[in-house]
Amino acid sequence: MLVVVSPAKNLDFESDIPVKQFTQPAMLEDTEKLMEVCRTLSPADLSSLMKISDKLATLNANRFAEFTTPFTPDNARQAMYAFNGDVYTGLDAYSLDSDTVAYAQKHLRILSGLYGLLRPLDLMQAYRLEMGTKLANPEGKDLYAFWDDRITYVLNKALEAQGDNVLINLASNEYFKAVKKKSLDGMIITPTFKDCKNGQYKIISFFAKKARGLMARYILENRVEDVEGLKNFDVDGYVFSEEQSSSTELVYLRNQESE
């Protein structure tokens, strides 16, 4: 079982990391090609392209300018500990034991606009480049054109290496769109999390993102190896709904919103 999640805009390059092991991103050559384009953009270009403040645009222009290889623990950080958004609050990587981190290295992947696909211990440097960014590049008008079937190829290799053909999609639509579903050598299962609001079950973005991280952690800690095992997920008040689920979508409902 292979799990894919989205990255996060917020980063943490300060906290102490509980592991010393690291690996190099598999798609770094592609990243360096993208960086050639990114380095040509001024802060004003980035502000317009990414719809971000001048301050953030300047920060990211500096990040692009300072990007350097080879990656080492001194100039980069393991991906699972570098991202700091709602998904990663749920995942809580810092509290995973060493055996679970090793398991995650084989069974968890992080989609990325700049790095394509990252393993948990792959080193990365700080960046902001969302997958939906319309960044013109030698391959086309946006990042989907750039990555084309590259990410899917690497996912297929990972599926083959870890022994089955089940891919658990815990990524956002923006990021999972970078996966060529027809070319994927596996069955895609998408968990969906709904909270009760005003008497109706709805996807509430903040809660759904955190729940994706909780689900990823659950799979890793419990070494879940089949879809039936996913149905036992009951963390943070979520309960599997057979009625609302299908063969490719597993729906979890929660009656009371958590803090």
Curated annotation (Swiss-Prot):
Record InterPro entries: YaaA
Similarity comment text for this entry: Belongs to the UPF0246 family.
Source organism phylogeny: Bacteria, Pseudomonadati, Pseudomonadota, Gammaproteobacteria, Alteromonadales
GO cellular component: cytosol
GO biological process: response to hydroperoxide
Pfam families: H2O2_YaaD
The name this protein goes by in its record: UPF0246 protein MADE_1015435
Matches recorded under NCBIfam families: PRK02101.1-1, PRK02101.1-3
